[in-house]
Regions:
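Catalytic cores of carbohydrate-active enzymes
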Residues: 1-116
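Non-catalytic C-terminal accessory modules of carbohydrate-active enzymes
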Residues: 2-3, 7, 81-224
């Protein structure tokens, strides 16, 4: 299978890669799938992906499958703020524009006339609550949530966030509170069953860490 993958990878690159580094029609979907399939250096492709989103006025305009990939990929490579700007966008097309209809549910499409007004087609943003804001990311070698990296996006748009996840290994919680430049982050992880790693962006200075049983409390200072 690996040999066949390499053959198809070379074929796809030769057929669809453009001189500017994009793939296919140069769409956001093209970047998302190229990164997921490992067609080029992911960090370089992700930077180009973000430039494309900016050119599109920060609107995520992929289809159902690439949209889901976009949240995971952009968060993985540190572009959570781009995701946040899109989710909080008020002008059409946007999620908030969908909700202005008053029916309190998402529609099938952002634009168009023939569509369902109650459809979960673009509800994949929910994964970002877990992977981005909570920072709970399973690693490639994980089986049943037994390998996790904690690396949350401490948004400046919200002051409190709590995420609780029931897994085969036990309950995992990531909860943080922001007060000015201070951030108090609390983790609950079944330490005897889960191989975990805590990653903190260089912009944050760790002041204090307390670990007791399955609970970890970390105090940070945001330098930006």
């Amino acid at each position: 299978y690996q040999q066949r993958y390499q053959e198809l990878k070379i074929l796809t690159i030769n057929k669809f890669k453009n001189s500017d580094g994009s793939f296919g029609e140069g769409s956001q979907s093209g970047y998302a799938f190229a990164i997921e399939l490992g067609l080029d250096d992911p960090k370089k492709l992700c930077a180009l992906f973000v430039e494309k989103v900016k050119k599109d006025d920060y609107v995520f305009n992929s289809g159902i499958f690439a949209m889901a990939l976009s949240y995971e990929i952009l968060s993985k490579y540190g572009y959570d703020e781009v995701i946040e700007n899109w989710l909080l966008r008020k002008e059409a097309p946007s999620y908030q524009q969908m909700l202005k209809s008053g029916n309190q549910v998402l529609a099938e499409l952002f634009v168009g006339e023939h569509l369902s007004l109650n459809h979960a087609m673009f509800a994949s943003y929910q994964q970002w609550y877990y992977q981005g804001l909570a920072g709970i990311k399973i690693t490639d070698q994980a089986v049943g949530f037994d390998h996790i990296v904690f690396n949350p996006y401490f948004s400046k748009k919200v002051n409190d966030f709590t995420c609780q996840l029931d897994t085969k290994q036990g309950q995992i919680t990531s909860s943080w509170h922001r007060c000015g430049h201070e951030i108090n982050w609390e983790l609950v992880v079944p330490v005897k069953k889960v191989n975990y790693q805590i990653k903190i962006n260089n912009r944050y200075q760790e002041i204090k860490r307390i670990s007791k049983n399955n609970q970890i409390i970390i105090k940070l200072i945001d330098s930006v």
